[in-house]
Amino acid sequence: HHIVDLCKRFSVPEPSPDSSCLYQDFGGFELRWERHTEFANFTFICPDVEAFSADALTFVPKDWLADMPGELVVAVNLVLTGEEPDEKKLYQWFEGQRVSGAWIADRKAQVWTAFKLHSDGFGRMVACNRGLTPYQAGRLVQRLFELETYRLMSLMSLPVARKMSHELGPIEDSLATLNQSISDIGAEKDERVLLQELSLLAAEVERHRSNTNFRFSASVAYHDLVRDRLNQLREEPIDGMQSLREFLERRLTPGIKTCNSVRDRLEDLSWRILRTTSMLRTRVDLSIQAQNQHL
């Protein structure tokens, strides 16, 4: 509905209700819109705008932007230029932040980014075309946007993982205490109480698993997409500068490992509770059989 509203304002053809993409010239800017499973992206394209002093959003109605539904996850300004910027220009554009960069596509392009937000609230990327066709340049821009989008989407599970890591400690301690109690069992009543406590622990772990499973699985999938886009870029190093891959390996991979570690802890806890419950049920059954035989 939001896209349709924009189209009506500029008197351009609207997408059909079941459309998942739109590419349209709005006069002062072009818009590429795509709807994905978890998010939608809006790419506003404007030619001949001075780098990072203005952007394509200048031409978009402010009230329309303010009313956009959902939560903002990724905001990036990308400049495509034909002239290689010198160190002074890069320092100015990236506001003194440490920049990662590389030669791309068999040295037909160069890209630079700081992978950080800048004073305008946007991330920044610069791509210098050194021999790409218009189609290839468009594909490069698309891959760079996807790289940043999938990078940030993959990290959405990190706060969940950190919170869950703190919550799993007490559950693991409770299970250890229950296992110790099982070794000290004397009466049938104790066994039944322990089974009930195990059942409550199992329910808590399963609740955590169901609440986090989608987020953790999505994180792995997005991380795979990041690596895929990196491979498609075919990076070659720029002297004295860390590559995009080096930055992502150093900053993104540990976060993904944290998420995978917490997910593995959850799976391990679930299996250990199941095994303990099974052993305890066997003891209860044997105890009941012994009582029946005695009777």
Residue ranges with predicted function:
Residues 25-30, 107-114, 219:
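Short small/polar-residue motifs
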Residues 1-82:
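N-terminal pre-transmembrane cytosolic regions of membrane proteins
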Residues 12-20, 94-97, 122-131, 222-229:
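Short, mixed-charge, low-aromatic patches
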Residues 45-203:
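Extended alpha-helical interaction modules
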Residues 202-295:
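Membrane-associated alpha-helical segments
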Residues 38-40, 121-123, 257, 264:
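Structural beta-strand/beta-sheet cores of well-ordered domains, especially the beta-sheet scaffolds
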Residues 3-8, 58, 62-66, 138-145, ...:
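Generic detector of well-ordered alpha-helical segments enriched in charged/polar residues
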